[in-house]
Curated annotation (Swiss-Prot):
This protein's record includes keyword Translocase: no
Gene giving rise to this polypeptide: frr
Protein origin, superkingdom: Bacteria
Location of the protein in the cell: Cytoplasm
Protein name in the entry: Ribosome-recycling factor
Organism from which the protein derives: Frankia alni (strain DSM 45986 / CECT 9034 / ACN14a)
Length: 185
């Protein structure tokens, strides 16, 4: 019973770390990746569809992306969705592909993105700590109900604390890498 609580807590902590990875991938750095387009949704024949399902992405230069739609009729809707997104870019359409040149990040914009990354990391840490608190309450309840001994409860809390520190450390490492990536010119 205690082992189930610990396993459940570890799964939820792992999920918090993976959400943090996704959030960090969506924060733009000097190099563009297709992940910056992951939140863009296109109105495709009346259905909201992620742009990554409608086109392929080619990155010939660090700040340029070429989007090639699988269906040429979706070209205008993809262009509109990218233009209306919060990326702050103006795509150009030549009839078969969409070419996007991202502007160079200013020092102020880089610092703003570092703040965004730090807030995403803090959200992940809070989520991990909430999972820990919930699991600790579950362990305490199991011990109080007499389904496990106090020694086993203390051992489980120690394991839970170690897992919490491990996952918070992973988030801190992801943040450190993202900050280094953002601040490198």
């Amino acid at each position: 019973m205690i082992d189930d609580t610990l396993l459940d807590a570890e799964e939820k902590m792992e999920k918090a770390v993976s959400v943090a990875k996704e959030d960090f991938a969506n924060i733009r750095t000097g190099r563009i990746t297709p992940a910056v387009f992951s939140k863009i949704v296109v109105d495709y024949y009346g259905a909201p569809t992620p742009v990554q399902q409608l086109a392929s992405f080619h990155i010939p230069e660090p700040r340029m992306v070429i989007i090639t739609p699988y269906d040429k009729s979706s070209l205008a809707s993809i262009e509109k969705a990218v233009r209306d997104s919060d990326l702050g870019v103006n795509p150009s359409n030549d009839g078969t592909i969409i070419r996007i040149v991202f502007p160079e990040l200013s020092e102020q914009r880089r610092r703003d993105l570092v703040k965004v990354a730090r807030s995403k990391a803090e959200e992940a840490r809070v989520s991990i700590r909430n999972v820990r608190r919930h699991a600790k309450d579950g362990i305490d309840r199991i011990v109080r109900d007499g389904d496990a001994g106090e020694d086993e409860g203390r051992r489980a809390e120690k394991d839970l604390d170690e897992a919490t520190h491990r996952y918070v450390g992973q988030v801190d490492e992801l943040l450190r890498l993202k900050e280094a990536d953002l601040l490198s010119v």
